[in-house]
């Protein structure tokens, strides 16, 4: 959307305010922003070694490197998650709307802080059908200036309700199933003492992160907010196509 906006394609009023000549008015450019927000509850475990201690240790990292060099196996061959699953937040839904990703590590800020000093796992949960919508808008006519991105995560009651249900499903699996009893799981974050839905979502959102799935800001379809047609051609223009994830309506 930024390329279109600086080129004069988008919301006419906003672009004129930035001194940009209007080539084509297209209200939907930069609107309808959607993303998958990942909640990252953390559980302490016993009788099971997570990767925390190995990653926090210089010697452990050395062993990880050697395993990869000589065996092409181990943590350096792993993907972002080792377990994935889908469930419904409510049985009445036609299809699953929650996705789990499980990692044998735990940390406060993924990629920006050390692993915890205990054995822990992170069973993340994300609403894959969010109803919240954000927007992205340029701040100047200079392509070197970053746009303003407003995600509006959890701005609808439905998204907050689904988030609470997802976190409670994770809690039930971790704390109430026979499978995990031998590992004596303890909810480190957000904390089993938090039972109110709104409080649970608020606490968990402090450690939530994007899964980097933004779509929708040049959506395909008909109507005022649609930017491209089913051939990816921009409405109102000739021979201009948008070919990336922004064309996905949802």
Q: Which residue ranges define each predicted feature?
A:
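FAD-dependent oxidoreductase catalytic-site/capping-region signature
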Residues: 41, 45-50, 59-250
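Glycine-rich loop(s) and the adjacent beta-strand/alpha-helix scaffold that form part
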Residues: 1-67
């Amino acid at each position: 959307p930024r390329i279109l906006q600086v080129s004069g394609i988008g919301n006419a009023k906003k672009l004129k305010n930035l001194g940009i000549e209007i080539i084509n008015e297209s209200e939907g450019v930069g609107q309808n922003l959607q993303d998958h927000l990942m909640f990252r509850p953390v559980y302490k475990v016993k009788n099971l070694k997570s990767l925390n201690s190995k990653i926090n240790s210089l010697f452990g990292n050395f062993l990880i490197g050697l395993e990869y060099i000589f065996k092409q196996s181990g943590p350096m061959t792993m993907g972002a998650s080792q377990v994935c699953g889908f469930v419904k937040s409510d049985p009445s839904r036609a299809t699953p709307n929650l996705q789990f990703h499980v990692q044998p590590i735990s940390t406060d800020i993924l990629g920006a802080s050390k692993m915890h000093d205990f054995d822990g796992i992170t069973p993340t949960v994300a609403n894959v059908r969010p109803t919240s919508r954000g927007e992205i808008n340029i701040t100047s006519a200079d392509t070197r200036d970053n746009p303003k991105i407003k995600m509006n995560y959890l701005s609808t009651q439905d998204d907050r309700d689904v988030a609470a249900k997802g976190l409670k499903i994770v809690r039930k699996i971790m704390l109430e199933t026979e499978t995990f009893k031998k590992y004596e799981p303890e909810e480190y974050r957000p904390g089993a003492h938090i039972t109110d839905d709104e409080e649970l979502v608020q606490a968990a959102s402090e450690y939530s992160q994007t899964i980097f799935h933004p779509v929708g800001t040049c959506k395909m379809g008909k109507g005022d907010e649609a930017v491209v047609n089913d051939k990816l051609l921009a409405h109102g223009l000739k021979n201009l196509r948008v070919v990336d994830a922004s064309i996905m309506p949802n």
